[in-house]
Amino acid sequence: MAVREAAIRAIRRLVGWNPDVLVVVGDAPRTAAYAAGQSGSLAGFGVPRSVTLGRATHHGRQCGGQPTSSLSLSLTVGAWLLEQTSWRGDVAGFGVSAMTAVRDAVQIGVALARWAARVALLVMADGSARRTAAAPGGFDERAAAHDATVAAALAAADASALLRLEPDLSRELMAAGRASWQVLAGASLIAGSSDTHVRSCVSRAEYVDAPYGVGYVVAFWEWGSR
């Protein structure tokens, strides 16, 4: 599938940055932290397979939230994609509830970005699940415009645009990724600056489509040293 191939390419670029820790962020029933070694199931996709998040050798620093034992589906998919790469370093997960307020999502992102000197975020976030009549939530004429806004923001590393996404509208459109994108926006506030200068950011959308009536974007944001 094209989206999976694009995601793996983007993740390989991410791990090639050699971060101190890689945090998989995604929607979850409640806001919670996950440590390496915790597992989840792909049964939600009809695949009877268990997936483990990295190795159970994480250095133990807490990234906030209430620790839990079973990965949410979004984090399980992220862990599965991460298995397809050469990453063997420190990894953790952070699940974000769809009920998370914008300001709280930003605070989570800021905290994650400060967790280590070099933090990489793998953000697993779906667009609207109401793009077509056959979509999981049926058709909503607002869905395409919503997802176009998200795709443009991710392509341009436009954190401000992500922060303008409305929680109520996102829930109506079944756009599960809203809070996770806003965590990314919060983290970018730290990644994009230092004590002495503003860092430049290279960003690009590698994939934008809506297979099965669900909006997906694969993009990367990478900050330079100046």
Predicted features, each with a name:
Residues 10, 154-208:
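Polyanion-binding loop/helix "lid" in catalytic or ligand-binding cores
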Residues 15-16, 112-116, 211:
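Solvent-exposed alpha-helices and their adjacent loops that cap or buttress functional pockets
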Residues 23-28, 95-97, 122-126:
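Short beta-strand segments
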Residues 53-110:
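Cap/lid and interdomain-hinge subdomains that line or gate substrate/regulatory clefts
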Residues 99-149:
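Active-site beta-strand/loop microenvironment that shapes enzyme catalytic pockets
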Residues 211-226:
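Short, basic/aromatic-enriched C-terminal tail that caps enzymatic domains
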